[in-house]
Swiss-Prot record:
Catalytic activity: UDP-N-acetyl-alpha-D-muramate + L-alanine + ATP = UDP-N-acetyl-alpha-D-muramoyl-L-alanine + ADP + phosphate + H(+)
Localization per Swiss-Prot or TrEMBL: Cytoplasm
Organism lineage: Bacteria, Pseudomonadati, Pseudomonadota, Betaproteobacteria, Burkholderiales
InterPro entries recorded: Mur-like_cat_sf, Mur_ligase_C, Mur_ligase_C_dom_sf, Mur_ligase_cen, Mur_ligase_N, MurCDEF_pg_biosynth, UDP-N-AcMur_Ala_ligase_MurC
Family affiliation: Belongs to the MurCDEF family.
Pathway(s) the chain acts in: Cell wall biogenesis; peptidoglycan biosynthesis
One GO-annotated biological process of the protein: peptidoglycan biosynthetic process
A Pfam family hit: Mur_ligase_M
Gene Ontology cellular component list: cytoplasm
Role description: Cell wall formation.
Protein name: UDP-N-acetylmuramate--L-alanine ligase
Native organism: Acidovorax ebreus (strain TPSY) (Diaphorobacter sp. (strain TPSY))
Length: 477
């Protein structure tokens, strides 16, 4: 038998799906190293934990590694991958490494086109509040923990299940949530929506016979697969036939208040829920968590405390505060990772509910040319629901440009639709200045996208702070 695996190297360790696995393995006692194309707060955090990280890729970085972990974003000709194959070092896809982690615990996997990160974070928070000390691996930073991964001492591990590359079919959970099924990442499924739905059925059938599927039946595609699911099911949603159902839903500032009726096999008392998140889509995410909690016999008081005290996830409706507007007064700056029209519509609706009557300014960077092409008309519709739009070029994410699927084409189509006059900004680096200069008193500015626009809100804050310092110096003279 070959020597035991001791040193694991991650190619692309800064990725949201990679850094969490790396951190958990480090905490399990493995020697962990990794590389990424650019420096980032994620790399610096891993370094502070004792993980050796490198900026850039080179064959020398895998020295001493017993296994090399890659994500689907890493190309086959990456020098570290080539070196590993040449030296007969196992090259392990990220999803398979996550599967190995799940063997150590009872796995709860959260799948779906939208809402995975928030739902996974809520489940981890509820289990933590109940004293179950879960291990979790999340695709975003759980604010209360200051990280997107943690090695707990309890019997459960909570993970996101990624359908984008089909890798969720490697996982072996004992409980699985499907928040929704939507036409995204269709290239993985040959642009066949039926194949995508069947993949979710296959994912659910990866569970043992005693596993439980928790499904949102408000989503038509999820409802479609119900007859095909052979394991026990708990349904949730706003629909009348949902076993875990929310009624009397209302927005109260940036919170949602609602009543939950639980009829999943037994009749439990109704719950009066305060959720410290905005938007009806987050009510659905919370219902999934409430269904999980019922299956695990989590006490209601712990469940309600966790939902009311939830401090959110990085880049998911993340407030950067009320900032000074150039013409006097203040505007609210919010950041969100949403980059699909369905996600954007939900987030814009949440902003309208949380800040009624205020002008909503959307700063958006499309993500991937293929998604822009496939969802072009839906993007035009959802962008048109904002009061003002700042639009920049598509974040390619490694794709080649596609004719008529770029940022300018989207801006032209939005202009022709006539609902809003977009401002096109060639370079996303210029967006912070445009936001700082153009935001008015009372505006809600929402920066959305999964690409480099993620750095814009912090730069807006820095810019306005510098402007304020200069103004103070001018007044002092």
């Amino acid at each position: 038998m070959k020597q035991a695996i001791r040193h694991i190297h991650f190619v692309g360790i800064g990725g949201s799906g990679m850094c969490g696995i790396a951190e958990v393995l480090h905490n399990l006692g493995y020697v962990v190293s990794g590389s990424d194309l650019a420096d980032s707060p994620t790399l610096r955090r891993l370094q502070s934990l004792g993980v050796a990280t490198h900026v850039g890729h080179a064959a020398a970085h895998i020295a001493g590694a017993d296994a090399v972990v890659t994500s689907t974003a890493v190309q086959a000709d990456n020098p570290e991958v080539l070196a590993a194959r040449e030296r007969k070092i196992p090259v392990v896809p990220r999803a398979l490494m996550l599967t190995e982690l799940m063997r150590l615990r009872k796995g709860i996997a959260i799948a779906g086109a939208h809402g995975k990160t928030t739902t996974t974070s809520l489940v981890a928070s509820v289990l933590g509040e109940a004293g179950l000390d879960p291990t979790f691996v999340i695709g975003g930073r759980l604010n209360s923990a200051g990280t997107n991964a943690k090695l707990g001492q309890g019997e459960y591990i909570v993970v996101e299940a990624d359908e984008s590359d089909g890798s969720f079919l490697n996982l072996l959970p004992v409980m699985a949530v499907v928040t929704n099924i939507d036409a995204d990442h269709m290239e993985t499924y040959g642009h066949d929506f039926g194949r995508l739905k069947q993949a979710f059925v296959d994912f659910l059938h990866r569970m043992p016979f005693y596993g439980t599927a928790i499904l949102c039946i408000d989503n038509p595609a999820v409802r479609d697969i119900l007859p095909l699911v052979t394991c026990p099911v708990t349904s949730y949603g706003l629909s009348e036939d949902a076993e875990v159902r929310a009624v009397d839903v209302r927005a109260v500032g940036t919170q949602m208040h609602f009543t939950v009726q639980r009829r999943n096999g037994v009749t439990l008392p109704d719950l009066q829920v305060v959720l410290n998140l905005a938007g009806e889509h987050n009510v659905l995410n919370a219902l999934a968590v409430i269904a999980v909690a019922a299956e695990l016999n989590v006490p209601d008081d712990a469940l309600l405390r966790a939902l009311a005290g939830f401090t959110g996830v990085g880049r998911r409706f993340q407030r950067h505060g009320d900032l000074p507007a150039q013409g006097g007064g203040h505007f609210t700056l919010i950041e969100d990772y949403g980059h699909h029209p369905v996600e954007m519509a939900a987030t814009l609706a949440a902003a309208r509910g949380a800040y009624p009557g205020r002008r909503l300014v959307l700063a958006f960077q499309p993500h991937r040319y293929s998604r822009t092409r496939d969802c072009f008309e839906d993007f035009v519709k959802v962008l048109g629901t904002a009061d003002a739009v700042l639009l920049t070029e598509v974040y390619a994410a490694g794709e080649a440009p596609i004719v008529a699927a770029d940022g300018r084409s989207l801006a032209r189509a939005l202009r022709v639709a006539g609902t809003v006059e977009p401002v096109f900004i060639d370079n996303v680096a210029d967006m912070p200045q445009r936001i700082a200069a153009g935001a008015r008193d009372g505006d809600v500015v929402l920066c959305m996208g999964a690409g480099s626009i993620g750095g814009v809100p912090a730069k807006v804050v820095d810019l306005l702070q510098k402007n304020e310092l200069l103004a103070q110096e001018g007044r002092a003279q």
